[in-house]
Amino acid sequence: MKNEGEKEGLNISRCRVCKPGSTLINKTGGWRNFRPVYIYEKCTKCGICHIVCPDMSVKPRENGFFEYDYDYCKGCGICANECPADAIEMILEEK
């Protein structure tokens, strides 16, 4: 008899760890509907976007600004919502 994990195709058994969804080999940015874009003229380099990103797709640059790794950004908009300077705009993703 198959356990619940095997029924779903996961083959989960005791003492195993499931692979996480956001890893270097599991690029998760391909299904987003909106893309965050920086407005560098407004950015104060506070780093809140970097701190709140659940996928760690906001990367610091040498000049103090930040950039997105769009391979992993899911477009959740948390960075834009939390930015105190309104320096991040969510734009419709072009497919």
Curated annotation (Swiss-Prot):
**Positions of the 4Fe-4S ferredoxin-type domain:** 34-63, 64-93
Write down the species. Methanosarcina barkeri (strain Fusaro / DSM 804)
Q: Name one GO molecular function term.
A: oxidoreductase activity, acting on the aldehyde or oxo group of donors, iron-sulfur protein as acceptor
Q: Which domain of life is it from?
A: Archaea
Quick one: which residues bind [4Fe-4S] cluster 1? C43, C46, C49, C83
Per its Swiss-Prot or TrEMBL entry, what cofactor is needed? [4Fe-4S] cluster
Name of this chain's protein: Pyruvate synthase subunit PorD
ATP-binding as UniProt keyword: no
Q: Which UniProt keywords apply?
A: 4Fe-4S, Electron transport, Iron, Iron-sulfur, Metal-binding, Repeat, Transport
The annotation note on the cofactor reads: Binds 2 [4Fe-4S] clusters.
Q: Describe its assembly.
A: Heterotetramer of one alpha, one beta, one delta and one gamma chain.
Sites where the protein binds [4Fe-4S] cluster 2: C53, C73, C76, C79
The taxonomy runs:
Archaea, Methanobacteriati, Methanobacteriota, Stenosarchaea group, Methanomicrobia
